[in-house]
Regions:
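Non-catalytic beta-sheet/beta-sandwich ligand-binding modules that flank or precede catalytic cores
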Residues: 1-439
Length: 439
């Protein structure tokens, strides 16, 4: 403290009546030893809200520094004294409490991110100005901050000074569906799989495995490879032999290998079940990965002897209803003895039937005491398909299911008797004898 001038509006005299004519200061107050006096009446104020934490997105359990900067060094005192900084963290707002400040222009507290906290893509900010319990005075003058001094200046909130985002909401799989139309699909068909998430996720260091309910463990797991910042992702399931489902659905979703599936805050799904609907609830996709096969060979004729000209229906039973891509392409070769070439029965067009029937007419010199089918073939590059379009590639007849197994002793005898010139001697036993006749 220094005296600037000394003056009077009247007169100043000594005891003898001499008037004082000079008011020059000989030794000022500040120059005197031990007389350093400082006068300071400016109240402290908040300059900004900031953080020592690096910019970025943070999830559950992360500790984030929140710093209040003042215009000068201050000290917090009083019973239960604290500075509270309310933060905007979604439906459940957080509050940072600072309990100790001693002769410092900054006051630091820690905000620990809790499950459910979010800034919804915005930067973390103080929801309102700090509140004070106790007193906050500057040092050393002791000027106390007032309520107006706690106001955050424009452009100086936490969101202005830092770019910190909070994402502590666990992501979920919201939906599993397919862009593939409802219907029945065969071997080799591709089925789209689409998974939707509650927010953008990143899959790293592994796969996202979707297990399907078609019953074939060798092809059940469909793996989706790594992706970055996707709110939905697609995969492709290719129908394989032995896949079967009346309503394609997933039985589980899981990470494969060392995979991680995280949102921007590092949060992973806590449940792998869709929050809305499953594939089977969204779609009506049927899978038929079974190729049709020959089930058995039969005939409507009973066991017995059959001669030249007799007609024997040959019936091929299939494991499911089939259709041919053209008429007269399905052929069955019968074992009709060594004298003739084996008979070939050609079947007409088949349209969604589990049985194909065609007549075999016994030829001269056909001979087999137990008629059977040697082989079944499809000619002309044509196909026998089931209703899903799966081709019958295996045309073998199951063991124990051939015609001779199903109906024993269909005896084909097309060999005509002949006179080989051998003399026949007959002896009359009695009765009339008719000339030129056997008696």
């Amino acid at each position: 403290l220094t005296v600037k001038t000394v003056a009077t509006t009247g007169s100043l005299k000594d005891a003898a009546g001499n008037a004082m004519t000079s008011f020059d200061i000989g030794t000022n107050l500040a120059a005197q030893s031990g007389k350093t006096i400082v006068v300071e009446t400016t109240r402290p104020t908040v300059l900004n809200i900031t953080s020592t934490k690096n910019n970025g997105t943070y999830g559950v359990g992360e500790d984030i520094n929140v710093r209040v900067t003042f215009s000068e060094a201050v000290t917090l005192s009083g019973a239960g004294a604290k500075i509270s900084v309310p933060l905007e963290t979604g439906d459940n707002d957080a509050t940072v409490e600072i309990n100790s400040v001693s002769n410092s222009a900054t006051a630091d507290g820690i905000y620990t991110v809790l499950e459910g906290h979010t800034t919804d893509g915005s930067d973390l900010t103080a929801k309102s100005k700090p509140t004070l319990v106790g007193t906050l005075k500057d040092h050393p003058a002791g000027n106390e901050i007032v309520d107006a001094g706690l106001d955050i200046p424009g452009g100086q909130n936490l969101a202005d000074t830092k770019n910190i985002k909070i994402d502590a909401v666990y992501p979920t799989i919201t939906n599993v569906t397919s862009t593939t139309a409802d219907g029945t699909y065969k071997i080799g068909d591709d089925i789209n799989l689409t998974l939707s998430f509650s927010e953008e996720l990143t899959l790293a260091n592994g796969t996202l495995d979707v297990t399907l309910n078609h019953g074939n463990t060798d092809n059940a797991k469909q793996s989706i490879n790594a992706f970055t910042d996707k709110s939905s992702i697609t995969g492709t399931y290719t129908v394989a032999v032995n896949d079967t489902s009346n309503n394609l659905d997933h039985t589980s979703i899981a990470l494969g290998g060392s995979g991680t599936l995280k949102d921007g805050g590092g949060n992973q799904p806590q449940s792998w079940a869709p929050t809305n609907q499953t594939l089977g609830q969204n779609k009506n996709i049927k899978i038929d990965g079974n190729r049709p096969k020959v089930l058995k060979i039969r005939s409507s004729k009973p066991a017995g002897f059959y001669k030249v000209g007799d007609v024997i229906p040959i019936q091929i039973y299939f494991t499911e209803a089939v259709s041919t891509t053209a008429a007269n392409i399905l052929k069955a070769t019968l074992e009709t003895g060594s004298t003739n070439t084996d008979a070939v029965v050609t079947f007409g067009a088949i349209d969604n039937s589990g049985i194909a029937t065609q007549d075999y007419t016994v030829r001269t010199n056909d001979l087999n005491p137990a008629l059977t089918v040697n082989s079944i073939a499809v000619s002309g590059g044509q196909r026998v398909n089931d209703q899903a379009g799966n081709e019958m590639t295996d045309k073998s007849i199951p063991t124990g299911k051939n015609l001779a197994d199903e109906i024993v002793d269909i005896y084909v005898d097309g060999v005509l008797p002949v006179d080989d010139g051998t003399a026949i001697t007959m002896t009359t036993k009695g009765g009339n004898v008719v000339a030129d006749k056997y008696n």
